[in-house]
UniProtKB/Swiss-Prot annotation:
Alphabetized UniProt keyword annotations: Ribonucleoprotein, Ribosomal protein
Biological process annotations from GO: translation
InterPro entries reported for this sequence: Ribosomal_bS16, Ribosomal_bS16_CS, Ribosomal_bS16_dom_sf, SAP_dom_sf
Name used for this protein in its record: Small ribosomal subunit protein bS16
A GO term, aspect molecular function: structural constituent of ribosome
Coiled-coil region: none
Database matches in SUPFAM superfamilies: Ribosomal protein S16
UniProt cross-references to Gene3D superfamilies, sorted A to Z: 3.30.1320.10, SAP domain (1.10.720.30)
Lineage per the UniProt record: Bacteria, Bacillati, Bacillota, Bacilli, Lactobacillales
Similarity field: Belongs to the bacterial ribosomal protein bS16 family.
Length: 139
């Protein structure tokens, strides 16, 4: 199910008032929605915007896509910047854990190829015809 964060029009004729809602992308603009996460009143001066930041960040983390107008509202409120920081902050952590895993010393359970890869990473010289026991001795 593709989920969108978009505006649901409320208010009277020529007096728009919008709710920021989480909805299935296939549902109509003013149709069924999953959750209300804010409001937007473009008539008031300045425009009145109320957003539930925690809920929006949660839905963005789950893959919800904001509409163009909602994207602008979130960007002006600074929510998209926080989401992008948290999203990019997670990626280097994953890379660090993979480096740590590859830096562990090999044991008897590792294959010869894994031991050779470890020795190559460490810069240790070995003969290509060396046996597993000889390679483990170099570690």
């Amino acid at each position: 199910m593709a989920v969108k964060i978009r505006l649901k029009r409320m208010g009277a004729k020529k007096r728009p008032f919008y709710r920021v809602v989480i909805a299935d992308s296939r549902s109509p603009r003013d149709g069924r929605f999953i959750e209300t996460v804010g409001t937007y009143n473009p008539i008031s001066q300045p425009a009145e915007i109320k957003l539930d930041e925690e809920k929006i960040l949660s839905w963005l983390g789950n893959g919800a896509q904001p509409s163009d107008t909602v994207r602008n509202l979130l960007s002006n409120a600074g929510i998209l910047a926080k989401y992008n920081e948290s999203k990019s902050g997670k990626k280097p952590a994953k890379k660090a854990t993979t480096k740590e895993a590859s830096a562990k010393k090999p044991t008897d359970k590792n294959t010869v190829a894994e031991i050779k890869a470890y020795l190559d990473a460490q810069g240790t010289a070995y003969t290509s015809s060396a046996k597993k026991a000889d390679l483990l001795a170099l570690v």
